[in-house]
């Protein structure tokens, strides 16, 4: 049980002490929220592949730090300037915000707000941390403006979304990054149209989000590509029409296999969800000449990727994305509503559950072929 001291909460959190080190449970102190901040009691969290990269120093090697950027919680306390939020509200901590007033927000064309962009400094807006090791007082870096693998977290209110409390908390956690990123890429970033063709490289949580988004947008052919045969069944549940396991065709490239299913033309939209650098060129080659669009979504931890410019000269478009282009205040509630009315069903995402006390086990579970999403309980 977390113990409260005046103004400070002592609780448990998962901490990474060094580059490539294990995630260990520590007792930490969580300061009260400052002016525009809220302190959140986490109800559940989940594991995203980016959290694995976090332990390896992505995007900046800051240690010690608390990983986790997916989760849902209830506000415990608020700063004096945290408008629109109050104790008891169910919220998602997020890694980007939406002011609604900056040039980017007013265009309606992007979710990358000038005022509340993604931040990976590991610190709050005033340049300090709200978390420290209880036994030593050493400051702990935040991750992606949130750090959700802790019983209590502090976030700026502009990076928090108050959500409908009727939604399943595990589902809300899955929507706070992975699934929404894939879904949004088809809806907000590329506007997949009715009758179009789509290829999805990597059928994890992000890839399944792409598949469901493409289905709801009316795509007629949705090709899933994965070396894990288990993902074929998962993809079908979310709307995939065709499945390719490259291991079954060692003499052919992925792009060749995709073209075989599209009369030699390739697809209108290809979404690269693995983060494997070499697959980006394959994704480009798998898209149609002149009109094909490729969206890299997977985070692979590579600082740079070599792209065959000759493929781009053939009129294909390469479009990068953050959070699938989904605006946190304007669009994310729409996706939540789709879940509440069963237009989107996320039960099939949840394959494993662990308690925060056993957080290191999650990294081994993630390697299992039947693992899609791991729920972290507190």
From Swiss-Prot:
Instruction: Give the UniProt record's GO annotations in the biological process aspect.
Output: formaldehyde catabolic process
Enumerate the subcellular locations listed in this protein's record, separating them with semicolons.
Nucleus; Cytoplasm, Cytosol
Keywords linked to the UniProt accession: Cytoplasm, Metal-binding, NAD, Nucleus, Oxidoreductase, Zinc
Tell me which tissues or organs this protein is expressed in: Present in non-glandular trichome cells.
Cofactor binding, per record: Binds 2 Zn(2+) ions per subunit.
What does the record give under GO molecular function?
S-(hydroxymethyl)glutathione dehydrogenase [NAD(P)+] activity; zinc ion binding
Pathway the protein takes part in: Sesquiterpene biosynthesis
Positions that bind Zn(2+) 2: 99, 102, 105, 113
Binding of NAD(+): at which residues? 49-53, 202-207, 226, 231, 274-276, 297-299, 321-323
Cross-referenced Pfam families, in alphabetical order? ADH_N (PF08240), ADH_zinc_N (PF00107)
- What is the name of this protein? Alcohol dehydrogenase 1
Instruction: Report the gene name.
Output: ADH1
């Amino acid at each position: 049980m977390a113990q409260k001291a005046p103004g400070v909460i002592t609780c448990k959190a998962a901490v990474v002490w060094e580059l490539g080190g294990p995630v260990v449970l520590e007792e930490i102190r969580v300061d009260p929220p400052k002016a525009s901040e809220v302190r959140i009691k986490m109800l559940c969290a989940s594991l995203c592949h980016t959290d694995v990269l976090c332990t390896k120093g992505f995007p900046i090697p800051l240690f010690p730090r608390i990983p986790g950027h997916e989760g849902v919680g209830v506000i415990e306390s608020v700063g004096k300037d945290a408008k629109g939020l109050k104790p008891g509200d169910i919220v998602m901590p997020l890694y980007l915000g939406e002011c609604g007033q900056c040039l980017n927000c007013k265009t309606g064309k992007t979710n990358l707000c000038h005022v509340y962009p993604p931040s990976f400094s590991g610190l709050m807006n005033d340049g300090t941390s709200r978390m420290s090791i209880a036994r030593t007082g050493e400051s702990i870096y935040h991750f992606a403006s949130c750090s959700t693998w802790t019983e209590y977290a502090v976030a700026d209110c502009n990076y928090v979304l108050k959500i409908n409390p009727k939604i399943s908390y595990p589902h809300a956690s899955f929507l706070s990054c992975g699934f929404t990123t894939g879904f949004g890429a088809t809806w907000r970033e590329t506007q997949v149209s009715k009758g179009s063709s789509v290829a999805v490289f990597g059928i994890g949580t992000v890839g399944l989000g792409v598949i469901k988004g493409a289905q709801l947008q009316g795509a007629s052919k949705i090709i899933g590509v994965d070396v894990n045969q288990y993902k074929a069944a998962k993809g079908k549940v979310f709307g995939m029409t065709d499945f390719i396991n490259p291991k079954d065709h060692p003499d052919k490239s992925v792009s060749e296999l995709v073209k075989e299913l599209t009369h030699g033309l390739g697809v209108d939209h290809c979404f690269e969800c693995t983060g494997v650098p070499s697959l980006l060129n394959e994704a480009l080659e798998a898209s149609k000449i002149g009109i094909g669009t490729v969206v890299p979504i997977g985070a692979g931890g590579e600082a740079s990727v070599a792209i065959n410019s000759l493929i781009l000269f053939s009129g294909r478009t390469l479009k990068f994305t953050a959070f699938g282009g989904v605006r946190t205040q304007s669009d994310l509630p729409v996706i939540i509503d789709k879940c509440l009315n069963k237009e989107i069903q996320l039960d099939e995402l949840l394959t494993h559950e662990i308690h925060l006390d056993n957080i290191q086990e999650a990294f081994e579970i993630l390697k299992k072929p039947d693992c899609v999403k791991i729920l972290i309980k507190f």
